[in-house]
């Protein structure tokens, strides 16, 4: 039997109305299992009780990403994400007191090398080579105290899965899952890595990120096109920066820059942690207070100052490349928080 468009639309509309109570019930059921808890230091927890499999998933949201970078340190938000897996003063080291002194020597050697490299009149090749050797030797001494991958191996041995992180323009995300009886282990590890992160093997990891850029951007036509497109779309706002950073910045920023980024943006009032799985909120809140209450409160991240000027004409990017043709089209839209 043939139905008119109006009758079909009416039937669909009635079906949607009939489904509304079910949707409302599902939402009410979800909200009944959700607990929001805020610590005195500003850190907010969202706890979703989902009985069933004895597994709990954890998601840490940090309200800072590549948009919080400034010229000269692009890629630093992503770089710190890598550093957050390197351990603490207690995890990832065989002798932290000695390692800390060795890292200070690495910093001093790097800055001496960097100053010579940047001389406006040109570097002395022989002196630069000697300074680079000294920097390399200092890194080798610091590396001798490192217990590699200890943070992730603790999680693996405890049955953890999905350990990972990602950095976007507006936020950085950390996540993994553990058996439900390992919640206290998670609370210790997660609070410890944001209470006392150690930027060990910084320059070695910086080399890893530089190689990541070569693979994802420099050697990929789509990567090169997207980078140019974003730069054209945002001529003033840091959304125009590549999240992975410009190569010249990756070659130049220092361990102290990463520490400063952490100090500025990783205060607990700039973070939200979601916990979902076989948990009871009232049972774990004291645990959260005990471990995460150690994080000192700090000021909120500085707001972005730069406002993107109004676009008054179409912007076109053409990128000649010996590859298959690629086409991309983008439109500016209001922020997700816009009323």
What is the role of each PLM region?
Residues 9-19:
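Bacterial N-terminal signal peptides
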Residues 87-89, 176-205:
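M16/insulysin-pitrilysin zinc metalloprotease superfamily fold
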Residues 1-4:
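N-terminal secretory signal peptides that target proteins for export/translocation
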Residues 74-82, 86:
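Active-site recognition of the HExxH zinc-binding catalytic motif
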Residues 23-68, 92-181, 215-270, 281, ...:
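Non-catalytic beta-strand/loop surface segments
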Residues 188-192, 286-291:
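Short amphipathic alpha-helices in soluble, non-transmembrane regions
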């Amino acid at each position: 039997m043939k139905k008119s468009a109006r009758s079909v639309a009416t039937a669909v509309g009635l079906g949607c109305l009939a489904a509304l109570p079910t949707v409302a019930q599902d939402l009410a059921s979800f909200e009944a299992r959700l607990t929001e808890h805020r610590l005195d230091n500003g850190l907010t927890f969202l706890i979703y009780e989902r009985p069933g499999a004895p597994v709990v998933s954890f998601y840490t949201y940090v309200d800072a990403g590549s948009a919080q970078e400034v010229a000269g340190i692009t890629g630093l938000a992503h770089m710190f994400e890598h550093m957050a897996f390197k351990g603490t003063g207690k995890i990832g080291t065989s002798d932290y007191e000695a390692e800390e002194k060795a890292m200070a020597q690495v910093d001093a050697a790097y800055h001496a090398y960097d100053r010579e490299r940047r001389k406006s009149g040109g570097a002395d090749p022989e002196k630069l080579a000697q300074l680079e050797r000294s920097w390399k030797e200092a890194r080798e001494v610091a590396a001798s105290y490192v217990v590699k991958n200890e943070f992730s191996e603790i999680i693996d041995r405890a049955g953890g899965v999905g350990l990972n992180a990602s950095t976007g323009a507006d936020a950085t995300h950390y996540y993994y899952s553990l058996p439900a009886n390992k919640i206290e282990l998670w609370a210790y590890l997660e609070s410890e890595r944001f209470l006392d992160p150690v930027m060990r093997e910084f320059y070695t990891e910086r080399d890893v990120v530089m190689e990541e850029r070569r693979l994802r951007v420099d050697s990929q036509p789509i990567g090169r096109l997207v980078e140019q497109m974003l730069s054209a779309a945002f001529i003033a706002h840091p959304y125009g920066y590549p999240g992975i950073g410009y190569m010249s910045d990756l070659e130049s920023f220092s361990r102290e820059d990463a520490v400063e980024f952490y100090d500025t943006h990783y205060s607990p009032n700039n973070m939200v942690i979601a916990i979902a799985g076989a948990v009871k909120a009232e049972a774990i809140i004291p645990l959260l207070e005990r471990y995460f209450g150690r994080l000192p409160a700090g000021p909120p991240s500085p707001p972005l100052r730069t406002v993107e000027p109004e676009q008054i004409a179409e912007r076109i990017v053409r990128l000649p490349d010996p590859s298959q043709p690629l086409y991309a089209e983008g439109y500016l839209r209001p922020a997700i928080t816009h009323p």
